[in-house]
């Protein structure tokens, strides 16, 4: 059935030409956008996931669309996109055109080997080509629409899209409507194939292989060829025409055979890799960005910034407020802005509705005036504060991008809706009287309104998927109709009506018949084409009505009841695809379920409910149970049960997803509680909502319809909605967790950048007479860096005020200790100290920084402080600061390409010293050094999970921090030119970027001039007004340094934060403050400004509020905050607003030197440490007299060190006095890997009492401990290594687990693992000491593994799990089949030795060699004979079913033969299955290999030939060995000639078997006669019903007895074994069969006799009556014997009357298939 579903969900692979011949098609492979990009709701995922439910009700014998190719899923929801199945294709012509090959290569993305090229007649028209193309296009028009609607390439709402490549120029103008399906062909990676690569014949090669290599590698490096072709250019540059292919508006590229000469000079684009050009910003696009008068970041945004009308701004502001500021996150997140951190999550919507107006103002500035965020934050404060600060403005900027994207997509979808509406109107107008078909749903204004009201990307996808469900298959028809009308209009317009019509007719004639629409066959379409829409509409509610019921939570719309039973109604819809009413109902339910699942209102309600109620359940995988220990990040949520997703915190869900990706956990998000006992009354969500689809009546008809509705609702939820909602919710939670991580990274960078440069004491600065030109005007810093490797030198770098390195110093022995043991080391250390002292004295730095590499930094900083103190005491040098600085940034800089380029000859540690000095000098500039195109900044450790967030998003967030801080501090352009070290800041200036910033510096360098005023940005640097407005206020000019070096007018305000637009107000304030007369001729506002700058306190008297009111009255707007800012700026120009530097506190020093954080080093953590010694408490004088004497030995014991071998008390005192007593041992000293010292008190060494720790641990030993206490000041930790603490069964030390932790599930898993461990640890055998080449001390599994590579018949002898007096001999019967033989030992000396005698069953052996030679090897030889037999079959290790299938198959092929096969049995090693099929049913028996030969039916055969010869003669004989039990399920058959009650046929059978072997047939006749049954030769033997057990495992259904239908036959006597099969009472009279003569008995001989295979003759011999006298005597004997047996039987408990049984062996013609009815029972002698 699934085959049919697949064939139904296919697309037609072949098309037919005019003559009806099949024209093979080139199948294009399309890969859709990723599932995040759009959840097209799994139209076909549904079909795949849900098809399993539909497999049973669609008939295979469908007559339409049989050759259609499986289209896979058109949804993005399937994680593993369904691959296209390979199908056999019949190709009538393999010689494809080059264009076809090109098309294949474009779509597959691989080169296709092309066959020999055949020259063809050139076609007059390209239209035929166009037509061929149309096949592949129509098929994917729905994808085209999706591409158009979501054309900006954005995935989930927050994801940034790749920049769309520039579209090629079109030669022909396209109609606007054509845009719906532009550029929708995608390659295997989902990228649009915008630029087809045409094969170009490269010159110089005729060899195909060489040319192919050249094409692959692109370059041939034959310089002679370059020379040869240089004049005319070695490559022909093809111009491409872009023509309208007239197939859904797709642009088709055709090479034009025109060539251009290229300039022979190589351009930059030929010399460098494109990636290098891109990273260096040298592409054409970069040049365009530089030239355009728009802020660089505006141009780089993936969604362009567009101007907006006031109405749209209002609408957008409201939307951004609701989504970004008023809607709380689903999970619990810290306040989104760390500037206001500490706010609880509930305060998310702290911004009131007044924010909306502020957002609108900000959007107006951004979209219409093109102001960047920092400009708005600094110069338009009145319009955004206090509601919005700078980070809120960035959020508005980001959400504006989302809004623009949503708006574009809505507009695209609206256009599509309008087109479909117009198309529907045309269709209906063509025949207005025709009623609408069931499958047609009119697209009305309600749908348009719903689209207009869409407020999120999720809702838009809902509307789009809803549209696809109802109108998806009409899209190609709509496009065709639109295309046809456009063509007609075009021709009419160009050539007039008459000519146009003629041409059109001619064109149609050339094109041939209309192409068949490529059909997408998904499950819904199949149901629709079968006309099930009508039945689906009779369920009583439309999806829209159900959605409204669901939204209002009451039955607003009553369910309409159709007046017929569902099954009765379904009969009208039965067809070839849905052959039964049940299948029809299943299909209708599928349609209803999918319609409900696609209804936007239903999805909106369910989405909201799902997010509120969703519960998270987590269980670990097998790997997770093993790997997630208490040190693992997933430990606290290893098991979770019903945790509401609303209670997830911060980045917790990201950790959960990571653990799931690593295969440690499985997560499940559901709307209902899972597995909670005692909550049975809680309704599931399904039970809550199904009532909205019910009709509350009790008639059978209504109940039946209610049942159908319930099943449809359940399917909609379980199969569609829950899965999709869980996925949506998971993506949202993951996005929130990632956003938290990005915010945490931003916060850390914010804290690093907010630190102001180091400032020495004011006195030091004033006394500094060393400020010459070389040193610069800033502070001088000496950076000291060292390596953690031993014996590496220490490097010092001196940096002047401008960040330039002026000197450096190498101290090779500075890391050695002053108190080192070796005198040589102490002397070298002293020399280095002296060298550093002189260096400090000469260079006089303001501060010394020491790298916080490890604990050694503490020693170095003490040494430096001591040197500084000595110099200060000697009044040789003012006191200078010594600071410890984190060297993480310095190490990153040390390894960067930038530092290598800047200090190529410096060793790495010296480069680190330079970075340390610069960092304390100005952290902002130093951090900017690692913001290169290599993205080095991401190597800094901001957050443990930073590598799991989207790199671009993290970079953008970090760059925002730089932009904020750089614009607050300002950038001195002239300093950046003079000192390239500070150039990195220019890219973050508002309005600029990496391209515009470097371009600005480049212009200034080319002009070899300094920037003397901000006006020059326009006049000299040609900056546009928009960029100038943005950046002018943040570029500062040091007007004081210009001094007399220039003749131009110096504007003092250029050195301040005052924006040029407000210079006049600043001057006015200065004039007013000084009370100058502005009307005077000699009034000089500039002079007033300079005076105010010297006496800023005069500004305090100004009434700025009145000034602001005056400005507002004059139309300048509200400027009161700006005026206060101007006053502050005039008081102190470009005052540094950063937090003053402070030395690191104790905790920061601890984290810096140990490289730990509170998350990685905490109380309760399990750690490993090395023992460094034993700690003792020195003895106190007053305790000397407490020595203890041992009365038994007479020796004295020291009360402290417990030494107990002192013969005299005086020796104990001497022991004290000499200082040789170490004192009382109080604990163990250890060292951790992070440099922290650990201490284990004696009582925490073990759960037992420990008096001497040195007996428990040794120095250098590694011990596992748990942290009890951390002392960050002393860098020490108290530890415990007691087993009870390490195990911590009571969870006193371990990290706390989640509130919803599932302890029960963990306990159950733990118990299961413990049981398994116990089972594995239990030794199944005792290791033995036995010298034999075949003996191995291994277990059962290891033996079988060893056997895999051994030969058939090889032996392994091993210990037995039965005990020490048993061995097991394992020998290889066949591949994968091994027999294990138990050997009993007797006469053992000990448990490990070999027994004197060995027994297998009742057979004795002297030693192992005898067992191998006399027992195993013969069996292996016999087995080999069977394995090599011509009728041997493997049958998957003796699989009965496989053997039966083989027999049935062979029997069908040769019905006149009786097939038989033998195969080794894996279930019973040592036995072989003998299968044969005389008639309709296969029969299977066992052949057992023994040392004597083959045992079959109780007889031993020494050869294979003898075995099969006997089998062929006796296969019809009954199988001996089964006696019926009294519990047999048998019934006494009804018979006219009833069986006498006093005869027990079972006993009779045993009696006959016990008779002498040489009894003649007359004797049997006499025995038969005494039963009182007359012979009735005409009676047909009973035909018993089929047995429910069957024979020998051959399956039920075999007849217990099968006899000939011939009425005149005579039964032949054989020993009777009554099988215990149940059967029905026969309808015919039954007579007891008589035993007739046999030439030789077929009764197997008794067990005591030597078995001799014998053959019997089946000749019918009619004995004359005259020979019966001998039989009478025997008859009397038999009768007497039977009477005795009967008497014994009567004494026993009365039994059921046994049934009479005809003889199983019926006399027949030899090898008659019809007469074979031997009941072959399994031989159970195992």
Curated annotation (Swiss-Prot):
Residues 111-122 have a biased composition (Basic residues). GO terms for molecular function: DNA binding; histone binding; nucleosome binding; RNA binding. Keywords: Acetylation, Chaperone, Host-virus interaction, mRNA processing, mRNA splicing, mRNA transport, Nucleus, Phosphoprotein, Transcription, Transport. Residues 1325-1431 form the SH2 domain. The modification Phosphotyrosine is found at residue 1515. Residues 317-1300 are annotated as: Interaction with KDM6A. Residues 1213-1282 form the S1 motif domain. It is found in: Nucleus. Residues 1633-1726 are annotated as: Interaction with histone H2B and H3. It comes from the Eukaryota. Residues 1-199, 484-520, 1636-1726 are annotated as: Disordered. Ubiquitously expressed. Histone H3-H4 chaperone that plays a key role in the regulation of transcription elongation and mRNA processing. Enhances the transcription elongation by RNA polymerase II (RNAPII) and is also required for the efficient activation of transcriptional elongation by the HIV-1 nuclear transcriptional activator, Tat. Besides chaperoning histones in transcription, acts to transport and splice mRNA by forming a complex with IWS1 and the C-terminal domain (CTD) of the RNAPII subunit RPB1 (POLR2A). This is Transcription elongation factor SPT6. It comes from Homo sapiens. The gene is SUPT6H.
């Amino acid at each position: 059935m699934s085959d049919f579903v697949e064939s139904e969900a296919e697309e037609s692979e072949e098309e037919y030409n005019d003559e009806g011949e099949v024209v093979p098609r080139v199948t294009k492979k399309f890969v859709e956008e990723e599932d995040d990009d759009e959840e097209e709701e799994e139209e076909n995922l549904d079909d795949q996931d849900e098809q399993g439910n539909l497999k049973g009700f669609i008939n295979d014998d469908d007559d339409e669309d049989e050759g259609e190719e499986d289209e896979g899923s058109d949804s993005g929801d399937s994680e593993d996109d369904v691959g296209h199945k390979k199908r056999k294709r019949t190709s009538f012509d393999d010689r494809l055109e080059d264009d076809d090959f090109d098309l294949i290569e474009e779509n597959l993305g691989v080169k296709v080997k092309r066959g020999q090229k055949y020259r063809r007649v050139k076609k007059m028209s390209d239209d035929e080509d166009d037509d061929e193309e149309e096949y592949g296009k129509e098929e994917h028009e729905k994808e085209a629409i999706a591409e158009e609607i979501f054309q900006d390439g954005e995935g989930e709402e927050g994801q940034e899209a790749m920049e769309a490549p520039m579209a090629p120029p079109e030669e022909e103008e396209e109609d606007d409507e054509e845009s719906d399906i532009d550029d929708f062909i995608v390659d295997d990676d989902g990228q649009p194939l915008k630029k087809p690569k045409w094969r170009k014949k490269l010159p110089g090669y005729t060899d195909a292989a060489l040319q192919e290599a050249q094409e692959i590698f692109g370059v041939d490096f034959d310089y002679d060829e370059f020379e040869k072709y240089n004049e005319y250019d070695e490559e022909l540059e093809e111009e491409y025409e872009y023509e309208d292919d007239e197939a859904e508006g797709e642009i088709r590229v055709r090479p034009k055979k025109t060539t251009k000469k290229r300039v022979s000079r190589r351009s930059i684009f030929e010399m460098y890799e494109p990636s290098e050009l891109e990273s260096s910003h040298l592409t054409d696009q970069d040049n365009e960005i530089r030239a355009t008068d728009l802020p660089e970041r505006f141009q780089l945004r993936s969604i362009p910034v567009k101007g907006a009308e006031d109405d749209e701004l209002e609408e957008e502001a409201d939307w951004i407020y609701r989504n970004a500021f008023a809607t709380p996150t689903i999970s619990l997140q810290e306040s989104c802005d760390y500037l206001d951190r500490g706010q609880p999550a509930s305060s998310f919507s702290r911004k009131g509705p007044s924010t909306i107006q502020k957002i609108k103002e900000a959007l107006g500035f951004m979209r219409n005036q093109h102001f960047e965020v920092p400009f708005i934050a600094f110069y338009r404060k009145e319009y955004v504060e206090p509601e919005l600060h700078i980070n809120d403005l960035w959020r508005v900027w980001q959400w504006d991008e989302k809004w623009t994207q949503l708006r574009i997509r809505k507009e695209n979808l609206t256009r599509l809706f309008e087109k479909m509406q117009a198309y529907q109107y045309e269709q209906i107008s063509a025949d207005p009287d025709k009623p609408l078909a069931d499958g047609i749903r009119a697209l009305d204004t309600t749908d348009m309104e719903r689209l207009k009201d869409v407020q999120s990307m999720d809702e838009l996808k809902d509307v789009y998927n809803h549209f696809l469900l109802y109108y998806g298959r009409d899209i190609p028809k709509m496009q065709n109709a639109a295309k046809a009308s456009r063509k007609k209009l075009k021709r009419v317009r160009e050539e007039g009506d008459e000519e146009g019509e003629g041409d059109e007719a001619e064109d149609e004639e050339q094109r041939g018949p209309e192409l068949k629409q490529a059909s997408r066959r998904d499950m819904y379409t199949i149901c629709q084409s079968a006309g099930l829409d009508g039945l689906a509409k009779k369920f009583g509610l439309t999806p829209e009505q159900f959605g409204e019921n669901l939204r209002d939570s009451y039955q607003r719309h009553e369910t309409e009841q159709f007046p017929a039973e569902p099954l009765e109604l379904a009969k009208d819809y039965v067809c070839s695809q849905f052959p039964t009413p049940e299948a029809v109902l299943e299909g209708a339910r599928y349609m209803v379920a999918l319609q409900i699942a696609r209804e936007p209102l239903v999805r909106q309600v369910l989405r909201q409910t799902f997010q509120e109620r969703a519960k998270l359940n987590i269980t670990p995988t097998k790997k997770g149970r093993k790997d997630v220990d208490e040190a693992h990040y997933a430990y606290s949520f290893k098991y979770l049960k019903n945790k509401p997703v609303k209670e997830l915190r911060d980045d917790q869900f990201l950790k959960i997803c990571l653990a799931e990706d690593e295969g440690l956990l499985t997560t499940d998000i559901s709307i209902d509680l899972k597995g909670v006992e005692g909550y049975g009354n809680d309704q599931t969500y399904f039970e809550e909502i199904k009532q909205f689809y019910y009709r509350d009546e009790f008639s059978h008809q209504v109940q039946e319809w209610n049942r159908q509705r319930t099943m449809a609702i359940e399917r909609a939820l379980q199969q569609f909605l829950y899965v999709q909602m869980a996925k949506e919710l998971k993506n949202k939670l993951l996005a929130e967790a990632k956003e938290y991580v990005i915010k945490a990274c931003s916060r850390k960078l914010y804290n690093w950048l907010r630190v102001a440069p180091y400032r020495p004491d004011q006195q030091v600065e004033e006394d500094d007479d060393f400020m010459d030109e070389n040193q610069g005007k800033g502070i001088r810093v000496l950076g000291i860096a060292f390596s953690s490797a031993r014996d590496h030198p220490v490097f010092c770098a001196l940096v002047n005020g401008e960040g330039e390195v002026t000197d450096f110093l190498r101290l090779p022995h500075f890391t050695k200790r002053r108190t080192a043991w070796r005198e040589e080391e102490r002397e070298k250390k002293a020399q280095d100290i002296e060298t550093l002292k002189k260096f400090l004295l000469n260079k006089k730095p303001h501060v010394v920084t020491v790298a916080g590499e490890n604990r050694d930094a503490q020693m170095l900083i003490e040494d430096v402080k001591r040197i500084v103190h000595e110099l200060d005491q000697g009044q040789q040098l003012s006191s200078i600061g010594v600071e410890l600085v984190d060297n993480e940034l310095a190490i990153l800089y040390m390894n960067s390409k930038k530092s290598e380029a800047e200090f190529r000859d410096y060793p790495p540690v010296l480069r680190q010293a330079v970075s340390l000095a610069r960092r304390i000098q100005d952290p902002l500039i130093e951090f900017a050094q690692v913001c290169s195109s290599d993205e080095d900044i991401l190597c800094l450790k901001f957050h443990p999970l930073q590598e799991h967030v989207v790199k671009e998003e993290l970079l953008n967030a970090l760059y925002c921090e730089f932009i904020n801080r750089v614009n607050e501090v300002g950038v001195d352009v002239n300093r950046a030119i003079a000192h390239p070290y500070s150039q990195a800041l220019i890219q973050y200036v508002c309005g600029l970027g990496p391209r515009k910033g470097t371009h600005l510096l480049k212009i200034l360098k080319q002009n070899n001039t300094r920037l003397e005023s901000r006006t020059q940005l326009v006049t000299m640097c040609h900056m546009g007004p928009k960029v100038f407005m943005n950046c002018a206020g943040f570029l500062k000019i040091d007007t004081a340094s210009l001094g007399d070096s220039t003749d131009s007018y110096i504007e003092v305000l250029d050195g301040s934060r005052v924006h040029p637009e407000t210079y006049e107000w600043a001057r006015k304030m200065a004039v007013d403050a000084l009370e100058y007369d502005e009307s005077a001729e000699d009034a000089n506002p500039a002079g007033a400004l300079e005076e105010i700058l010297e006496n800023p306190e005069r500004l305090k008297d100004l009434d700025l509020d009145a000034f602001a009111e005056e400005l507002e009255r004059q139309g300048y707007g509200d400027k009161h905050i700006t005026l206060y800012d101007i006053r502050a700026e005039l008081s102190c120009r470009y005052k540094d607003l950063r937090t003053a530097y402070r030395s690191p506190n104790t905790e920061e020093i601890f984290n810096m030197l140990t490289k730990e954080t509170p998350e990685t080093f905490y109380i309760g953590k399990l750690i490993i440490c090395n023992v460094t010694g034993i700690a003792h408490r020195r003895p106190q004088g007053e305790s000397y007299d407490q020595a203890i004497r041992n009365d038994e030995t007479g020796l004295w014991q020291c009360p402290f060190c417990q030494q107990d071998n002192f013969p005299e008390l005086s020796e104990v005192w001497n022991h004290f006095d000499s200082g040789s007593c170490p004192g009382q041992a109080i604990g163990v000293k250890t060292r951790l890997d992070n440099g922290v010292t650990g201490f284990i008190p004696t009582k925490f060494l073990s759960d037992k009492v420990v008096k001497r720790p040195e007996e428990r641990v040794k120095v250098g030993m590694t011990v596992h401990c748990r942290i009890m206490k951390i002392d960050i000041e002393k860098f020490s930790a108290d530890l415990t290594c007691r087993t009870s603490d390490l195990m911590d069964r009571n969870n006193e030390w371990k990290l706390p687990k989640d509130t919803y932790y599932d302890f029960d599930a963990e306990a159950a898993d733990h118990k299961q693992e413990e049981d398994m461990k116990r089972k594995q640890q239990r030794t199944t055998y005792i290791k033995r000491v036995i010298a034999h080449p075949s003996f191995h001390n291994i277990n059962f599994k290891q033996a079988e593994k060893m056997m895999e590579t051994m030969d058939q018949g090889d032996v392994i002898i091993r210990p037995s799990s039965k005990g020490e007096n048993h061995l097991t001999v394992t020998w290889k019967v066949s591949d994968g089949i091994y027999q294990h033989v138990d050997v009993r030992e007797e006469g053992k000396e000990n448990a490990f030795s070999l027994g004197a005698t060995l027994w297998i069953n009742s057979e004795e052996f002297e030693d192992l060699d005898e067992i191998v030679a006399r027992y195993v090897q013969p069996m292996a030889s016999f087995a080999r004979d069977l394995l090599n037999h011509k009728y041997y079959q493997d049958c998957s290790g003796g699989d009965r079913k496989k053997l039966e299938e083989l027999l049935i198959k062979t029997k069908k092929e040769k019905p006149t033969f009786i097939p038989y096969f033998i195969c080794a049995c894996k279930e019973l090693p040592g036995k072989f299955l003998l299968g044969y099929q005389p008639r309709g049913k296969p029969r299977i028996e066992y052949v057992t290999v023994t040392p004597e030969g083959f045992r079959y039916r109780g007889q031993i055969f020494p050869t294979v030939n003898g075995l099969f010869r006997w089998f062929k003669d006796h296969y019809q004989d009954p199988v001996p060995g089964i006696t019926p039990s009294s519990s047999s399920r048998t019934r006494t058959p009804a018979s006219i000639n009833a069986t006498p009650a006093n005869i027990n046929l079972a006993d009779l059978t045993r009696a006959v078997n016990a008779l002498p072997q040489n009894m003649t047939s007359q004797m049997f006749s006499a025995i038969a006669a005494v039963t009182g049954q007359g012979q009735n030769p005409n009676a047909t033997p009973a035909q018993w019903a089929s047995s429910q057990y069957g024979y020998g495992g051959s399956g039920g259904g075999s007849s217990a007895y099968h006899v000939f239908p011939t009425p005149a036959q005579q039964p032949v006597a054989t020993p009777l074994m009554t099988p215990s099969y149940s059967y029905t009472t026969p309808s015919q009279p039954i007579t007891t069969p008589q035993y007739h003569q046999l030439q030789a008995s077929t009764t197997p001989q008794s067990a005591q006799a030597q078995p001799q295979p014998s053959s019997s003759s089946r000749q019918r011999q009619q004995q004359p009556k005259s020979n019966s006298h001998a039989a009478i005597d025997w008859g009397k004997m038999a009768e007497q014997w039977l009477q005795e047996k009967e008497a014994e039987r009567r004494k026993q408990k009365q039994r059921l009357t046994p049934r009479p049984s005809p003889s199983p062996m019926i006399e027949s013609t030899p090898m008659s298939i019809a007469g074979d009815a031997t009941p072959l029972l399994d031989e159970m002698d195992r």
